């Protein structure tokens, strides 16, 4: 994308990868977006976000909004985020290792139709991810043989919490069609009903 963008500005949401696994500015992006609520905070107790840019003009405008509009984190959220970043590398290594194990396990289950995780060699983005990332992250999607099966998986898990967030130390599962993407109904962004999203935590697997 960076090679063919022309005069367009490229902004990459790097929330799933974090700066530990991928650095979009070094790959040609103009700006990078992070939800610090997720992996950077890492403990499901922060609300925040960050924009990183190499563009001095954009940086100046962002500083203006921060100073005049108040687009800054609360002191306590800033403290929690700084605390979380101290363990980012250790946590991300564990997220990646656990996700790889879970993806490979699920891929061998007859109940599962498809596992979408870039750490699997049959994933269409595996080669690219291996080239530009230092790990494959902790997020995956799993497709089952029916929408009802997917819903029942979400409603009957005993070790994984049913919740919309991601990037915390605990594993979370959700049904995007009826949760995170419910507002996308009627658009091209509607996920398949048989799809489940899992945020793999740092538990002992």
Identify the residue ranges that each predicted region occupies.
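Mobile, glycine-enriched helix-loop/loop "lid" segments at the mouths of ligand-binding/catalytic clefts
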Residues: 57-60, 162-177
């Amino acid at each position: 994308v960076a090679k063919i963008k022309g005069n367009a500005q490229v902004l990459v949401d790097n929330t799933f990868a974090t700066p530990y696994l991928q650095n979009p500015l070094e790959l040609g992006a103009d700006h990078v977006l992070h939800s610090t609520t997720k992996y950077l905070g890492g403990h499901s107790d922060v609300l925040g976000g960050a924009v990183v840019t190499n563009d001095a003009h954009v940086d100046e405008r962002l500083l203006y909004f921060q100073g005049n509009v108040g687009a800054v984190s609360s002191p306590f959220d800033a403290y929690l985020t700084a605390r979380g970043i101290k363990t980012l590398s250790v946590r991300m290594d564990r997220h990646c290792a656990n996700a790889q194990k879970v993806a490979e396990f699920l891929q061998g289950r007859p109940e599962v139709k498809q596992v979408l995780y870039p750490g699997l060699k049959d994933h269409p983005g595996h080669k690219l991810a291996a080239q530009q990332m230092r790990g494959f992250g902790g997020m995956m999607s799993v497709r089952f043989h029916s929408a009802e099966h997917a819903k029942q998986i979400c409603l009957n898990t005993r070790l994984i919490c049913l919740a919309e967030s991601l990037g915390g130390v605990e594993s979370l599962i959700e049904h995007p069609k009826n949760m995170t993407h419910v507002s996308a109904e009627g658009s091209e962004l509607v996920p398949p009903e048989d799809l489940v999203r899992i945020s793999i935590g740092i538990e002992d697997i």
